[in-house]
Amino acid sequence: GGNDSMYGYANIASMLLVLITAPMLGALSDRSGRRIPFLVITTCCCVFLTVFLGVGGLFPALVIFVGANYMFQSGLIFYDALLPTVSTERNRGKIGSFGVGVGYLGSLLGATMGILLLGSIGHIGMFKVSALLFLVFSIPCFVFVKENGSSKYLGSRLKALRGSVNQLIKTLRKTREYPGLSRFLIGRIFYADAVNTLI
């Protein structure tokens, strides 16, 4: 059951959660000096939730979708932050562009595969296949990407979280020094959402 508007509301809810928590998550990973552990956690949570999409009725499915999409979008924060680790200043633009292009290609291939398999395994089966492929294609990043930096903050989780909040506040105050930055970030949110909707 359900309709497109229900999916839209669920998507908005998950993106609002990302919007609220993303700066804190980014600051937390910066203070820890590590991204892979956070990426592993968000990816595994997303995979786990995706497996159960479509099971248990409409409302549970929407709630699970909110959680899965939140974990996926949060994982992108840590994934994107790995770019300096896998590139140099000279080739960073090329590496980043190549990664984005391959990602969009993967989306097209995934959609094509979904069209071919949907009739035989159904929507619920497609969610399970998507979860499996997401996990499989994430493993090389977990295994082969080696971060150079060590943890910069060895205190308790509570202290790390408090420090991240303080760092976030300082960063937000500094945005006043760059008038165009806030407009760019807000525009980026709507641009990225439109692109994701298109693909």
PLM feature spans:
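Symmetry-related core transmembrane helices of the 12-TM Major Facilitator Superfamily/SLC fold
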Residues: 124-143
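Helix-loop junctions on the cytosolic side of multi-pass membrane transporters
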Residues: 85, 138-156
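Hydrophobic core of transmembrane alpha-helices in multi-pass small-molecule transporters
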Residues: 45, 49, 56-75
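Central cavity-lining transmembrane alpha-helices of secondary-active solute carriers
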Residues: 7-27
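Structural signature of the two symmetry-related core transmembrane helices
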Residues: 36-52
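Juxtamembrane intracellular "pre-TM" segments in multi-pass secondary transporters
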Residues: 148-186
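Cytoplasmic helix-loop-helix junction between adjacent transmembrane helices
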Residues: 64-102
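Glycine-rich segments within core transmembrane alpha-helices of 12-TM secondary carriers
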Residues: 19, 93-115
